[in-house]
Structure formats: C-alpha cells, structure tokens
C-alpha cells in the first residue's frame, strides 16, 4: 500500500507539472497568433531599423519552433510560406520526435509510460491482410490433410467421378500393396483364421451391397485392414481385400491365407509382371496383377473390386471350378480347424502375414543346420500311404531345369518328378505351361513363401512329414 501511495503521489506531481507546462505553452501560442494577425509594425520604418527587424523575426521563429515542439501539428494555413519555413518545420518535427522519445524513456524508467504507439495503427489493413493470408494457408493445409486421410485406404475413390480420380492418381503411386481374394462365401466375412473388428461401412457407386471395413484385433497396434464387399454381378462371390503388414505372431489357423497373400504380394513387388493385364494360372489360382500404371477410366478386371482405387493390387480368384484349385480350398478349411496331432513347436516362431518384401519367415531357415533335419525334428516321417495334392512339389532337381516350388519347369520339355523316396515307384510326366523366369526366381528366392508352403503341407497331411531336400536354399538362389 505504501508503494502504491508513493506511486500515486508521483503520478499526481507529474500530471500537475504537465498541466502547468501546457498552460504556459497555450498562453505563448495565443500571443504568437495575435502578433501574426497584426500588420507588421516595422514596414514604415527606415533602413536603419532593418537589423532590429531581422532580430525580431528570428525571435518570432524561435517562438514558433517552441510551439511546434509542444503541439507537434499545425494547419497548412498557419505554417509560414517559403522554403525556409518548410525546412525548419522538418527540423522541428525531428526534434519533436527526439524529445518525445526522451520523455517516454524517462517516464518508462519511473513506471509512468503514458505514450501512445502509433506505429501499429499506421496501416491496419496490412495486419488484416497478413492474418487473412495465414488463415487461408491454414485452411488449405487442413483441407489437404483431410483429402489425404480420406484417400489413405481408398474410402472415397470408388464413389467419386473420373475427374476426382485423375486428381488423386499421383498420390496412388505411393500407396500400399493390396491383395484381393474372390471366393464364394455365404457368411458376411470369409473365415481366414484371423480376428477382425468392423469399424465402418460405405455404399459404393454401382454396387447395392455395402462395403465393410475391418481391422485386425490380435494386436492393438496392428496396421492391417480388410475391406469386404459382395460382387454386384454375382452376390455369392465375396471380395476380401487385405492391406498392411501384421506386426505380431499369427495363429496357426491364419497361416493358410497368410501364405497365399504373401506369395501373391511378393510376386507383384518383385516385378514379375510389368503389364497390368497379365495373369498367371498357378495351380488353379488366377493371379491378376495390377500395378501403378492403372488409368482412372477403365476399371476392367473386376469392376466392383474394392482394390480398384489405384493401389498396386493382386487378385486371387478362388471362384473357378478348377480341379487343381480344390486342394487350396481344402487347405483353407483345414487351417480353420487345425489337427490336434500337429505340434506347435518353436520350429516356426514367427508367423507374420507379410505383404511386402520382408525377410521375416514363417520358419527358421538359419542356425547352420540342415532344413530337412528341422522338418524331421518337428514333424517326424510322412505317411507313405497318404496321397496329398501337393506331393508334386516334393521333387528332385532335373538336369537343365530350375527349381520351382509349384512343380513346374522353366524349360520347354516336361519335367520328371521322382517320388521314390516316399514310396511311389512310378514317374509322373505332365505338360504344364511354363512360368516367366523372373516369376520363378522371385518365388524361389523368397524364404517366407517356402516356409509358409512347408507349414501348409504339414497341416494338410495331419501326420508326420519328411521332406527330402536335394535342393537347398543356396542352390535355389543360384539357379537361373
């Protein structure tokens, strides 16, 4: 309280001093104005009074400068004419600015800042323009982020016009790889062995059936998403589109679809087929490859496929009635309820559904041991009386042919498959269309595909497994 009282006392004394100075200056100003309006008294006098007249004029000018210093602003009619007066007024304004600066500095030291800053108010439109530009930039950034978030999983592209697709097409170049699976299913979703939670659905253009969106719930941080939609041409066909990579171990019931989608995605990412319309029939599974060069106007291969939004996509068609496709369908059914006599040992510690070129495998191929010993330790011996549709994969390397996990050869002649080591004496010869050399190399050099295939075989057999590995992984990598 004492400090406040002392400050109020100093403030009152300063105000009284300012008021007193103002009254004195006002009186001087009135006197000068009265003299300015009167006729000059020195004009009728002689030449001997010129010197005194000049002195009086200098005194008047000095008084005018004092007035200008106190008030700072005068009307044009009150300013004396002549270039000398204008120069003096400029000097007066500069002196006034210096004096005001000194006064403000002194008052700020005493805690009595009474000055008004005119600089911020000199051009208010400039500040408004800057604020408007900043607001416009923030709105543009938020709109761009909103568009990117809507297009991150293709939620909006199928329902838009072709003009919107033309604008979004450059962003599709960096989108993730998708694996679309077409299957005949009466249930709302296909039982792929994984755990999913539905978080939304949307009506797409040209399809009365809604498109449902699911996310993997095995791990909270799993980025894998799945889109499910019925085909508009055939309501019995369910189209499931997978996107992302699991970052957690998968249950054994999910490894069948994991191996199929992993192999398909690896083929696409390895560049086995550069044409967007190319298709390969691998044991009855119709692989349709579509790269980044998709044009927005033709949605040709599967019109209602959720993956037709510009993502690099592989389509696995399980709807055909090919006899060679039945083993894969039975494999899916068996994986949904795995046999009890298959040991879930540490031979396959990491079961990752890999949609990218990753070296994570479903089995441990390292460790310096023989892979066949690992199979024998995990599964024992295979039942020689059990005929599996995948027995053609177990083969020896023939002269002049490269190893193919699908039982095919890149050479023109038909391969010979020797099955003597599992009790079959005859040699089966069959003619199949050859695959591109790049596709064979991409498949054989992918350890995740080989390990996933071995795991699938062990579950299909339901018994002991013994595989004669005449071709090791290093030899497969060196093969043409």
UniProtKB/Swiss-Prot annotation:
CC terms in the record's Gene Ontology section: nucleus
InterPro entries, per the entry: WRKY_dom, WRKY_dom_sf, WRKY_plant
Entries under Pfam families matching the protein: WRKY (PF03106)
Biased composition (Basic and acidic residues): 57-66, 84-106
Chain positions covered by the region annotation Disordered: 30-108
Binding region for DNA: 185-251
GO molecular function: DNA-binding transcription factor activity; sequence-specific DNA binding
Keywords: DNA-binding, Nucleus, Transcription, Transcription regulation
Residue spans crossing the bilayer: none
Signal sequence segment: none
PROSITE patterns membership: WRKY
Tagged with keyword Nucleotide-binding: no
Compartments reported by the entry: Nucleus
Function: Transcription factor. Interacts specifically with the W box (5'-(T)TGAC[CT]-3'), a frequently occurring elicitor-responsive cis-acting element.
Protein name in the entry: Probable WRKY transcription factor 61
Gene: WRKY61
